[in-house]
Amino acid sequence: LQNIKPQKPDVSNYILFFGGISSHKGIEYLCEAMDKVCKKHPDVKLVVAGKGKIYFDLNQYAIYNTGHLVLLNRYLDDNELVGLIRNSLFVVCPYIDATQSGVVMSAFALNKPVVATKVGALPTMVKNGQYGTIVPPKDVATLASAINTLIENPQKIEAMMANIEHDYSEGKYLCIVIA
């Protein structure tokens, strides 16, 4: 991390999904949840950053049509990715199937909380309430509620960031910063 010069993103006040785009990542559920979130918080955006085939119809989501979705469907270099993570409110991993995730450890290396689904080892990595929030997979209403709760309670985000910094300081996990 010390050698990476973060690039400031062109967007602000956003929630971040990053990593390879594929059907087991549950991005469509996140887009649907963000449709609900943006009705309540129209100043918040979703950044989806990573390379892969978009496997669902983006046009069905209001966030795509209103500009609340920023899609960076390409390879991101280290500087850009670190900048995106550092400047996000928090990271979301809405996976419908996973064993573990380098995305979580990358977020933690930069002290960012994670909203993740209860699949694979994610609940073990993201201790609910301590480093982020765990929600059931494919549960749009609960995912939207978890996102809204963090947006509306920045002190929760700050407390989670402090927990992550204490338990996962930048020096401990330098080798796994980039997913």
Kindly label every feature range from the protein language model.
Residues 83-99, 112:
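Acidic donor-binding loop of glycosyltransferase active sites
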Residues 58-82:
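Nucleotide-activated donor-binding/catalytic signature segment of Leloir-type glycosyltransferases, i.e.
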Residues 18, 45-58, 74:
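Glycosyltransferase donor-sugar binding loop
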Residues 9-25, 31-34:
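Conserved donor-binding/catalytic core segment of Leloir-type glycosyltransferases
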Residues 128-129, 133-140, 148-154:
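Conserved acidic donor-binding segment of nucleotide-sugar-dependent glycosyltransferases
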Residues 15, 30-34, 46, 107, ...:
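A structural motif in glycosyltransferase catalytic domains
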Residues 105-106, 119-129, 133-134:
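Short acidic/histidine- and often glycine-rich active-site loop of Leloir-type glycosyltransferases
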